[in-house]
Regions:
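A position-specific signal in ABC ATPase nucleotide-binding domains
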Residues: 48-49, 56, 102
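The short alpha-helix immediately C-terminal to the Walker A/P-loop
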Residues: 42-43, 203
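C-terminal boundary and immediately downstream tail of ABC-type ATPase nucleotide-binding domains
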Residues: 223-246, 273
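ABC ATPase NBD Q-loop/coupling interface
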Residues: 54-76
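ABC ATPase nucleotide-binding domains
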Residues: 77-79, 83, 87-229
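Non-catalytic connector elements of ABC transporters
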Residues: 5-27, 32, 38-39, 46-49, ...
Length: 347
């Protein structure tokens, strides 16, 4: 099972150039608003048409500009969950799901598939409820049932938690993740939330200004984002220009320091990143004097902002985030950073 996408589309001054392959499991398109994530889904679904390129699902060509192939949405076997779920407000749960079976002529088969989907999505007993009578999570399950009753080969989710209150999201992430694991085919999900991407996906494709920069296994991306946009999207707070001065050494002019790295530094280095949790009071490597400029308290964590002794005046302070339980009685005069925790970011 595989999805192959290589598409190009000009939209005024914006240009979409996306090329990737996805296999069984959940692949997340992660990027800022307006980077082309949702438009990519619409091209795959057949709602929008690229200017050129190729889209293939499990060996079947959905779109090919050179061969003049452009299957209509209903023939692509692609399920698309919109941000607002697009349920019919005047229809019951039963009626909404049956809309997905409008091409099934056998009444007994319709009822069998409906009952199967109601059980799978834990909607039994809600058949005669209308969307307004359902919780946000129940509405999402109805929308998914309407899609999955058609047995799509690819399921696409566009910001699946954006319509939900914040306090519902964590429990519904677990529910949806379990459902997607039972789906058994490719899933493509769009989000701008790094937490959702990390929780839900096995792979992440990073998008920036219409381009797909990289696609990696989820944990690998957070461990080694490789570029400034990917580091920003994965939540790295400390990103600063740097240059290579040795095989495993970089200079950071804005901070007035040199750092030893665990990875070999390649040519084309643009910056380094250090996650706010990575600073350490005990580490002796890459240890330099610091002065503290700001302290901010969160419910469970403490954020300290500091500057290195040789740091330039116009460079922003550096973030250190630690558990409130680990707050030192006196802040240390110097902090270290393990060479393994230096993220090398390339052009």
């Amino acid at each position: 099972m595989s999805l192959i996408v290589d598409i190009h589309r000009a939209l005024g001054s914006f240009r979409l150039d996306v090329s990737f392959e996805a296999e069984n499991g959940v692949t997340c398109l992660l990027g800022a608003s307006g980077c082309g994530k949702s438009f990519t889904l619409k091209c795959i679904a057949g709602i929008e048409k690229p200017d050129s390129g190729h889209i293939e699902l499990d060996g079947a060509v959905l779109y090919d500009s050179e061969k003049h192939i452009n299957l209509p949405p209903q023939k692509r076997q692609v399920g698309y969950l919109f941000q607002n779920y697009a349920l019919f407000p005047n229809m019951t749960v039963r009626q909404n799901i049956l809309c997905g079976l409008h091409r099934e002529k056998n009444r007994a088969e319709k009822e069998r598939k409906l009952a199967e989907m109601l059980k799978l999505m834990q909607l039994e007993g809600l058949e005669n409820h209308k969307p307004a009578q359902l919780s946000g999570g129940q509405q999402q399950r109805v929308a998914l049932a309407r899609i999955m009753v058609n047995e799509p080969r690819l399921l696409m989710l566009d910001e699946p938690f954006s319509a939900l209150d914040a306090h519902l999201r964590d429990s519904l992430k677990i529910e949806l993740r379990d459902m997607l694991q039972r789906f058994g085919h490719e899933v493509l999900m769009v989000t701008h939330s790094r937490e959702e991407a990390y929780n839900m996906s096995s792979r992440i494709a990073v998008m920036d200004q219409g381009r797909l920069l990289t696609i990696k296994d989820t944990k690998d991306l957070f461990a080694d984002p490789g570029s400034i946009p990917a580091a920003v999207l994965t939540g790295c707070k400390n990103i600063v220009p740097a240059r290579k001065v040795g095989d495993r050494e970089v200079e950071v002019p804005d901070w007035g320091i040199r750092l030893q790295t665990a990875q070999e530094v390649r040519d084309g280095l643009a910056a380094i990143g250090i996650r706010a949790h990575y600073f350490n009071t005990q580490t002796r490597q890459n240890r330099f004097p610091v002065s503290y400029v700001e302290e901010m308290e969160e419910p469970f964590e403490l954020i300290l902002q500091f500057r290195y002794a040789g740091q330039t005046a116009d460079s922003p302070p550096i973030w250190w985030r630690l558990s409130k339980e680990k707050r030192p009685g006196e802040f240390p005069e110097a902090l270290g950073i393990s060479p393994a925790n230096i993220l090398l970011l390339y052009e």
